[in-house]
């Protein structure tokens, strides 16, 4: 399945074609190659020790959240409605993958529910079942917003934190699922999945204002804050797709995997409830 989705090919191409163009710190790539037909892939990246690795289970501090939002905003601004996007046709877009994700969601919903039935909040269960017929419509809706490159899996487990004495302050890895779509989709994913509910409620508004302000400072125009907030809420609903498909396909049966799933479901449930996301679904 992973070969069919071309995840490894995309990551190798990202390090070769996109990483040299950006200011956002990524691990230095010493070698990368892929053979799609044989299913063989290799990527040799620099060792970032002794930098601190983010931990999705533990959750995000205010300082790390602020840094993560500022850095991804600058990355998004660099490709905002850029002509360079047309040359990156190997990166999937929201509209072109809408039907694929619709099918994957329906295919993986039952395996997902079977794995998490003991820890899935009832509100999230209802939304997950109702969302089964709405994935493509939500993704097509998001494709109408200004486009940039999304990381696609922007969360603490994919972040390495340095110090002022031994920088960079943030290095981002795991570029297997970049997407072309609304940048704030990365923000919705990060805030919903990485920040515990109480902390999110206290910091969410400020983080979104920070994200929008950095976009504007970097030259983004024609995108007002109300549009950003609308896309944020819709993107958060879309990310239920990511949870269902990933949990359905992958093995989270070890101790940390189980803790990760519980933490992410708890955070997602609170975010969905606070933002009343069920009202966004057609029908």
PLM feature spans:
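All-alpha amphipathic helical-bundle segments outside canonical DNA-binding/catalytic cores
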Residues: 220-236, 268
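Active-site catalytic-loop/activation-segment of kinase and kinase-like phosphoryl-transfer enzymes
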Residues: 77, 87-138, 241-244
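ATP/Mg2+ or Mg2+-diphosphate-binding catalytic cores
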Residues: 234-283
């Amino acid at each position: 399945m992973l070969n069919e989705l071309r995840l490894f090919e995309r990551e190798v191409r990202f390090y070769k074609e996109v990483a040299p163009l950006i200011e956002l710190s990524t691990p230095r790539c010493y070698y990368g190659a892929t053979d799609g037909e044989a299913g063989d892939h290799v990527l040799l990246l620099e060792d970032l020790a002794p930098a601190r690795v983010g931990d999705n289970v533990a959750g995000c501090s205010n300082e790390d959240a602020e840094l993560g939002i500022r850095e991804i905003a600058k990355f998004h601004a660099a490709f905002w409605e850029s002509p360079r996007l047309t040359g990156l046709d190997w990166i999937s877009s929201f509209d072109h993958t809408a039907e694929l994700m619709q099918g994957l969601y329906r295919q993986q919903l039952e395996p997902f529910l079977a794995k998490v039935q003991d820890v899935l909040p009832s509100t999230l269960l209802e939304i997950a079942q109702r969302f089964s017929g709405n994935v493509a419509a939500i993704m097509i809706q998001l494709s109408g917003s200004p486009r940039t490159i999304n990381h696609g899996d922007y969360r603490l487990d994919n972040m390495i934190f340095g110090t002022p004495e031994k920088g960079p302050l943030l290095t981002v890895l795991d570029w297997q699922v970049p997407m072309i779509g609304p940048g704030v989709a990365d923000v919705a994913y990060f805030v919903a999945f990485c920040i515990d509910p109480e902390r999110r409620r206290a910091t969410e508004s400020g983080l979104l204002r920070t994200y929008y302000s950095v976009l504007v400072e970097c030259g983004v125009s024609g995108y007002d804050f109300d549009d950003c907030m609308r896309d944020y809420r819709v993107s958060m609903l879309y990310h239920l797709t990511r949870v269902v498909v990933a949990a359905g396909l992958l093995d989270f049966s070890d101790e940390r995997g189980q803790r990760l799933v519980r933490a992410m479901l708890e955070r997602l449930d609170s975010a969905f409830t606070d933002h009343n996301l069920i009202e966004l679904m057609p029908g």
